[in-house]
């Protein structure tokens, strides 16, 4: 049985701590409740906005929509052998807590992704990644409610079309609602230590437990705690450009940090670009780029969505002018009707 609330303050439910009031709100704790809530939205002619951990969203001050807050819990062992486990996890589980649990159980693969904010159900949407690992590498199935077909279904890893910060769930944002995710994790560790200072930090103690510990320490040293400095983590994607364009850039900026990608492309460190453009630690009113990590936009003092847009567009403009590169924001921008807007609107 669903419980419908009205004029609900969403400030506690978005990590940027934006002041947002939703006209309608339902906490969803099962697939049946989700279906019932969607039927209600259809009857009331309301758009349904899916709220997960609120760590990748830019919301307006007023939402005339039905906010569905996904809080589906649970963990089920699907299969286990001597080499691996397959586990089905509720979309409402806190991502970091889930990663800690897998390490404690001796299930390996996700340690590089520790301390990423948000919930399990949101992890496939933008194929979350950090320190050389992406979650899509360990996803077996994504369990969804298909709003077009009005049915529950599973989507294989291959059909998720995972790419850098991308998936089919971004291509069709209104079609699928993720309820559970099935992961395949391994009992023998295969540590990925090639990214940045991770190898140095891990040192001689090359264990999954120490890897996770060092990832957490590195993130805590560079990234502000959203409870102290409201933020959505990395605000901009790292640009991926052609080798030809990169070589031209390298002649003018020989120290630019970069990472080879498939198909003769190169990923550029967006944080370095922002730092070089003078934005690290710089503020415009209530919003600024964090002093320890230029890639993180922070709400310092009760900022509104308009304040956030004003700041990140200034950053985009300066990067475009200096490097001839366009930075694309990671978080999704929503309009007052609960539908996704272009970042440039």
From Swiss-Prot:
EC code: 1.3.1.98
Active site per database record: 165, 234 (proton donor), 330
Keywords noted in UniProt: Cell cycle, Cell division, Cell shape, Cell wall biogenesis/degradation, Cytoplasm, FAD, Flavoprotein, NADP, Oxidoreductase, Peptidoglycan synthesis
Signal peptide bounds: none
Biological pathway: Cell wall biogenesis; peptidoglycan biosynthesis
Known function: Cell wall formation.
Listed name of the protein: UDP-N-acetylenolpyruvoylglucosamine reductase
Native organism taxonomy: Bacteria, Pseudomonadati, Pseudomonadota, Gammaproteobacteria, Moraxellales
């Amino acid at each position: 049985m669903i419980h419908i609330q009205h004029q609900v303050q969403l400030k506690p439910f978005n990590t940027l701590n934006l002041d947002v009031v939703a006209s309608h709100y339902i906490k969803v704790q099962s697939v049946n409740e989700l279906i019932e809530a969607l039927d209600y939205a259809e009857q009331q002619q309301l758009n349904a906005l899916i709220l997960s951990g609120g760590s990748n969203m830019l919301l307006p001050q007023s939402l005339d929509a039905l906010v569905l807050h996904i809080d589906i819990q649970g963990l089920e062992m699907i299969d286990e052998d001597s080499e691996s486990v397959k586990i089905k996890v509720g979309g409402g589980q806190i991502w970091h807590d889930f990663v800690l649990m897998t390490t404690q159980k001796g299930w390996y693969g996700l340690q590089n992704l520790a301390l990423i904010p948000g919930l399990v159900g949101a992890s496939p949407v933008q194929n979350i990644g950090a320190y050389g690992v992406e979650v899509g590498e360990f996803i077996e199935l994504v369990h969804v409610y298909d709003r077009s077909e009005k049915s529950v279904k599973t989507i294989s890893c291959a059909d998720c079309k995972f790419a850098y910060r991308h998936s089919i769930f971004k291509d069709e944002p209104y079609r699928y609602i993720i309820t559970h995710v099935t992961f395949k994790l391994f009992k023998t560790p295969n540590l990925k230590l090639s990214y940045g200072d991770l190898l140095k930090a891990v040192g001689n103690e090359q264990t999954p437990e120490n890897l996770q510990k060092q990832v957490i320490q590195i993130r805590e040293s560079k990234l502000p705690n959203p409870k102290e400095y409201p933020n959505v983590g990395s605000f901009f994607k790292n640009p991926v450009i052609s080798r030809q364009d990169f070589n031209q850039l390298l002649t003018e900026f020989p120290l630019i940090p970069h990472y080879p990608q498939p198909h003769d492309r190169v990923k550029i460190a967006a944080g370095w670009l922002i730092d070089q453009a003078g934005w690290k630690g710089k503020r415009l009113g209530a919003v600024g780029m964090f002093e320890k990590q230029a890639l993180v936009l922070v709400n310092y003092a009760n900022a509104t969505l308009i304040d956030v847009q004003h700041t990140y567009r200034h950053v985009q403009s300066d990067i475009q002018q200096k490097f001839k590169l366009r930075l694309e924001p990671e978080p999704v921008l929503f309009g007052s009707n609960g539908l996704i807007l272009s970042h440039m609107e």
